[in-house]
């Protein structure tokens, strides 16, 4: 199937461009009988939407979702769920210049040579705006996983540019525009962003995502390991340059005697695995981290060439996100939810329905989740 | 399609277990008319095979591949290519004990609860032995990519446990059992491995993979970005816990003014992107890094439980790899080749045949590849 | 991928229900650079739309399509093409009764037991209205195939109930509401339909579809033969109960000496194969026939049961098609076009781009097409 | 996925050529825990194998299957099941001549122009020999369906050339080499075949296939209707030119008042639908018919051309099947079983596990199956 569909059984097919009339998704394979309304979806969309603080793009989009199909009298019918979000704040008058140039770090160059030309309006299909339908689709997955397994998702910023953001408490995440699980570091982050904006520059971010109450047994050997499909989904988010599961790159310098998570009758003693063993969920908390590169659209002039290969200087004007990572947390959660949902269905196809298989030992040990 | 098939158009479906009668793969979608013989495949298999140095598993396997189909008078016909490798050194007499226990860090626990029971002989399906058919299949992809685009692959060890392995020269890679691109560090690596083995412990590794002469335009928005499919393939390799493209996690603390690779009439000035822009190959060298966790089978006793949840102590006896990362380089190359091959076919399906589209500017600038 | 997507590379994912707010499709994998506007699509939609004669459903739908994405400055960009058709004539007030009963021959019974309940409004997802997005999507495929290979499609009614409709001339097809390639039989067909309507009954139809200038080489052994994928697509149309390629069921009683189409330097002498050999297009005219069952919604009372299994009598009131086959011709053409388009892309993925491979002998011989 | 894989969740990937070293299949997605041995598979293979009567090809093949993987201690593990059948009776010495010519009705012409050349040995990939791995794979599906739902399959010859073969009793099918459910017609069929062989000609056949105890609810709207996937699978069998479900082409001339199967508290009153409603199984007996064309390899000379387009005469020498339809019954059963198995898993993925959902009314009424 083509590149705009995610998943094998719970599939999300998106369409739309940044400055076209609308964006949206078709969600197929949703189990029937689940209550669903626009309100269930809107909450997550609102967490992602632009313009919520001065640190992100000032584009004004309500991101109001319309369910076009797949729901009857408030319940999913098993038919595909059409989701539509109209674009309202397109400003595409003056892209003519952009069409002739390649902005360093942007998709321009690759799109141009792949397709022969490109839609330059706000990045077209390569815009981060296209994560909105993904977040909308994932809200459906989250609801089902919550109802069936009690699965819960949360994400938070682990690092903003050079500043590490220590995890204090989950409750802080919703209290600030950075999705920081930390109540004291916000002024420092705000100062950092203001300085960046003044310098006409941008920075990257590290986002952490977690899922708890994940059923044991999700993921398929060999190629479609749960972590492999998570890596695929995460690396599919705009600007992501790295993905880690559990100890990630730290495991390179760990000894085996340290890395392997001991098992005790009351659960795993640690979580270096990040919740997967042999590519299959172990019931422990799933732990994923992603690296997001600094925004390419900056006010600082950069060397580039035009489509004829002639040297030019490129400098972004107008609104932009100095750190796309700030709004990435709900997107990363969404991707994780979509992968789990797809694998929950794949698992019950092959192995039958299970309501969170509970082994003689609990999957997690008190206090083992945050080592 | 189920989890044992990789790719959409150039598909590799593997089968087999560590200690079953045979392992193998069916490679479908190969373009017709390419000369192919067992010899083309055997070379890569030999680079991966066990028992080549004292630092890896001492299992004796010839890994001799037989082509069962898809080739007529030395040429691929377009029909699926069946590849068969007989297992010869199975020692599965005494697995009874293993069946009752979960080895920390192993797939045992997850397989047991997913499938209800498991094949314990040498790890069954979760054994790293199953990378052999992948390497065999990828040899076909490499050959085609080389003939069509001049694409070349190489990988090397970037770090062994705590020891960084500086890149000196590609030519050294084949001169030592570590795939180190460095001629001086070998004694240090050997000493480190000997010490680990004495300590009954294991370590992780960081592997770097590169592809040059990659056509511009490979990769599909949105979900099947080239880097997304690379991440999927790499995370599907046993023991991989992290994947990076280009600057990877370093991009978190980079400024946009630094990260974005400038373009000049003679090529890109740097390669922080790792060869993809917007998920599409830019023609620059592809750069991927993976983190491999330390081997779970160690001589050091670990706490665990048996399948009834009772506490036990687990200690591996007999042959094992103290660092599975040592043999991972050809496997990582193989995965990269399979992803590129699949996307080369996907690209020409949608956009027509191209023989390495050459833009007015060359994709790489003299000296820009190793910054 | 789930059941609402057709195709591997040129994929059509539809959504919507008969009486929901909208129906539509996402068309992914379209080659870039083709001029496309709503007008290109509307023509085929208009041929399919209801209410065009007194012999079909009187539902009033404009079936006006909106392109939501994938086109920039009048050209396809390679991004997914979102197509939206708003429903305007929904009359869903009084379905309460239908929800409790199973109409004989309808999907009610199967949907109810598959999903646990169903959307009863106008048949919900099982309505023939859902062929509109398919026709819209196929208009894109037809345009591309025409431009690249000169491929042309036409279909016609071969039989209406008990009345065979002899083929006279292609030009007549557009001159009557039955898609009959015959100018003299129309009064007889009209009389037959009027009589049926008076009797409160319905009838089936046999539709013939043809494609000419089909490139040689489309179709993939083993399972995805061109004819296999055509059969899949055709049998996916509502009410279709049979599919034939070429001589079809007549080939059962043919001798091999008669059935096998002789080859001469000026082309094939006959076309019993229907344009495929070994599941691959031979360049001859593609010939497909489908059987459409009589409409299940009839004014004649039928025995049935309610959802509790109690006996009831079911009798349709209000508007309905006495022969859904009358409007099926453009739908069958659409399905054929989608399959050819998908296989055209699949072929050039594996075998490279070909502009209608021309063998030393022409694929068709003068006069051989209509034997 | 490429064309040599059937199914979405229960996937069968075949490889091999008629005269290569081996043929085989990888069966992926099989539920774990089912007992399975070669003996379970061999029985169906033996029903299909050549050389069992004087009316079929005299090629001597034992068709002995080896299970290479996916089974541990006699039970399926959930890992892919590798199946291998060595070819033993290849006679490929003198194909040189065939390579230069196109045999009318054969795949030669299409393969040649698709791939640029072809494997001529016994038809290569296009040989009916490749149905052996399909039959082997389907034996696994049949076993699982039988154990879970009590599903049973049988097929029989409905017509041989011009001779209709009336259905008398299922028990006769295994008593004659024609799979005729009729004990009296056998001498007539044998005489017909002897005459054909003397005439150097061949004939077609009509095969009927049935499945009973099919769970309600299998099949997916819109495109992957159960009947659509059945049509795809059946048309994928060599030499099949037509597929019917239930009343098939007879439904064209049926009135709606006759065609629609009445429902009564004790079941359906008839079975014109053939066991599907809206593309979803209704629990009634599944009824499929296929048309098989006469064998193309005949002793009668036919006009053709060589690969340079020059006129030639083609005449088959040596062993051949004068009616490939004679051995097609177990193949058609196999295809039906594979489709049902795949949809059984797809259904429980989306809708949860069901052990043959039993509605308040039974799916079939006493005596309704053979109307």
UniProtKB/Swiss-Prot annotation, chains A, B, C, D:
Reaction catalysed by this enzyme: 5-O-(1-carboxyvinyl)-3-phosphoshikimate = chorismate + phosphate
Origin species: Polynucleobacter asymbioticus (strain DSM 18221 / CIP 109841 / QLW-P1DMWA-1) (Polynucleobacter necessarius subsp. asymbioticus)
InterPro entries attached to this UniProt entry: Chorismate_synth (IPR000453), Chorismate_synth_AroC_sf (IPR035904), Chorismate_synthase_CS (IPR020541)
Binding site for NADP(+): 48, 54
Cofactor note: Reduced FMN (FMNH(2)).
Positions annotated to bind FMN: 125-127, 238-239, 278, 293-297, 319
Official protein name in the record: Chorismate synthase
Biological or metabolic pathway of the protein: Metabolic intermediate biosynthesis; chorismate biosynthesis; chorismate from D-erythrose 4-phosphate and phosphoenolpyruvate: step 7/7
Function per UniProt: This reaction introduces a second double bond into the aromatic ring system.
Cellular component GO terms, alphabetical: cytosol
Cofactor(s) the protein requires to work: FMNH2
Enzyme class (EC, first level): lyase
Keywords, in A-Z order: Amino-acid biosynthesis, Aromatic amino acid biosynthesis, FAD, Flavoprotein, FMN, Lyase, NADP
PANTHER family in alphabetical order: CHORISMATE SYNTHASE
GO molecular function (one): FMN binding
């Amino acid at each position: 199937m083509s590149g705009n569909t995610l998943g094998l059984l719970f599939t999300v097919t998106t369409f739309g461009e940044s400055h076209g009339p609308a964006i949206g998704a078709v969600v197929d394979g949703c189990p029937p009988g689940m209550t669903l309304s626009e309100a269930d979806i809107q909450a997550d969309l609102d967490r992602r939407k632009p313009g919520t603080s001065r640190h992100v793009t000032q584009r004004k989009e309500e991101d109001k979702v319309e369910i076009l199909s797949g729901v009857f009298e408030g319940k999913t019918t098993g038919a595909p769920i059409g989701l539509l979000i109209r674009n309202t704040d397109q400003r595409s008058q003056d892209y003519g210049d952009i069409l002739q140039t390649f902005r360093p770090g942007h998709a321009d160059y690759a799109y141009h040579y792949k397709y022969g030309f490109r839609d330059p309006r706000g990045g077209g299909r390569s815009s981060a705006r296209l994560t909105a339908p993904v977040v909308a689709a994932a809200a459906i997955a989250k609801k089902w996983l919550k109802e069936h397994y009690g699965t819960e998702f949360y994400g938070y910023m682990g690092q903003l540019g050079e500043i590490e953001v220590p995890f204090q408490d989950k409750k802080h995440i919703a209290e600030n525009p950075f999705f920081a699980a930390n109540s004291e570091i916000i002024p420092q982050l705000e100062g950092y962003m203001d300085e960046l904006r003044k310098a006409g520059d941008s920075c990257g971010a590290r986002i952490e995502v977690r899922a708890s109450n994940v059923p044991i047994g999700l993921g398929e050997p060999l190629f479609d390991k749960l972590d492999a499909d998570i890596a695929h989904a995460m690396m599919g988010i705009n600007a992501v340059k790295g993905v880690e599961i559990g100890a990630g790159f730290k495991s390179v310098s760990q000894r085996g005697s340290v890395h392997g998570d001991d098992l005790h009758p009351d659960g795993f003693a640690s979580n270096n695995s990040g919740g997967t063993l042999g590519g299959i969920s172990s019931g422990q908390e799933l732990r994923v981290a992603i690296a997001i590169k600094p925004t390419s659209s900056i006010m600082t002039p950069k060397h580039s060439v035009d489509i004829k290969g002639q040297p030019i200087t490129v400098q972004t004007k107008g609104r932009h996100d100095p750190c796309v990572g700030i709004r990435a947390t709900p997107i990363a959660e969404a991707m994780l939810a979509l992968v789990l949902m797809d694998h929950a269905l794949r698992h019950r196809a092959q192995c039958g329905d299970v309501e969170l298989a509970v082994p003689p030992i609990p999957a997690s040990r008190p206090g083992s989740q945050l080592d």
